């Protein structure tokens, strides 16, 4: 008997969590919480399960060994990864759509996401001062380019990745900014 793959079953579970993020029978604030739970679940899924599958697939490929099939589902690590990725891409597209809809509904309740360009002068001064006094002192951005290797990224930490344009056309570098756990969220 072949069973349902554990990883694919887990993605189905997280799809049900995501569905609560668009369920009109669930209060709006709770919908947003379910979207956050979905994201947190997916982060952990990639750190633990997808990470170990990737290691197994790489090991099997590098040793030119016959790929080991899971005895319950008869799938190799590479086959599991190939099944996970498109399913995850669709779930993430759905999450993005639900999040955009939730932002619209929150705006109807008086909550809105404001771009920096649309702040009042008073708010702009406040946030610039806040950045300079509270955030800037604890930021430690890192550049990744041909002279600077990719840094070690700690597990369960939050990072902001930024593409930096250089003076030369089509030249880009990657900037990585660790978001300190000292920062209030």
Kindly give the residue locations of the regions a language model identified.
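N-terminal non-catalytic structural scaffold regions of very large proteins
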Residues: 1-185
